[in-house]
């Protein structure tokens, strides 16, 4: 695959995005709304995540949890190639429930990088099962491999339980942004929503999300823009509808964070090849 290419593949299971990629791009700090797990096929990269700075080389498993702030850069000019599956939390939740025997409703990947040949082999089999159509026994193979892979790589026994999560005070400030990221918001607004001082809001945001309030707002706007684009909204409308000044503003943020333009992402969302 040529460097700089992101190739989406048709996926048999709803709520799963399969991508084969090759890139020399240095990704800025960003988050995903999905769980991501993949294998580096060529080259190597360094990345900072909520679980520390790591390096991944060919054959390694790479993972990311929803909302986890991370970046990524190749270790040399040759770049790196990888395959990755992104899972909506609704896909992962029942697997975690089964693996934990009902103890957890959602888990998280334990490590951002794993050097585990067995898990890598299982992932590649799962990637093939997810992208090879709907044979008579495809669902059984797919579901079995998914459960095996997540049982090996995800902590489902100490996952999030009811009543756990973000402290209630800052949760109100997060909700102020999450409810409609397109609406302008000030630090004063967030302080009033949470009942905290502006400085307390800054510290609490960093503890809860790893981002400043402004960076969190921009990320949530990008998340909203991605959903609008995936639903077929014109790019200019998606930009305005998600709170950006215009399409060029959205495009600059998109490229910095994800290494591809909104129009390229639209192609991925509709299953078209990126060339």
Regions found by a protein language model. Name each.
Residues 98-162:
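Amphipathic alpha-helical segments enriched in hydrophobic/aromatic residues interleaved with Lys/Arg
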Residues 127-136, 152-160, 173-186, 205, ...:
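Basic, amphipathic alpha-helical hairpins
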Residues 165-171, 188, 200, 275:
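Conserved catalytic core of the tyrosine transesterase superfamily
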Residues 178, 183-220, 239-268:
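Basic/polar phosphate-binding segments, predominantly the helix-turn-helix DNA-binding elements
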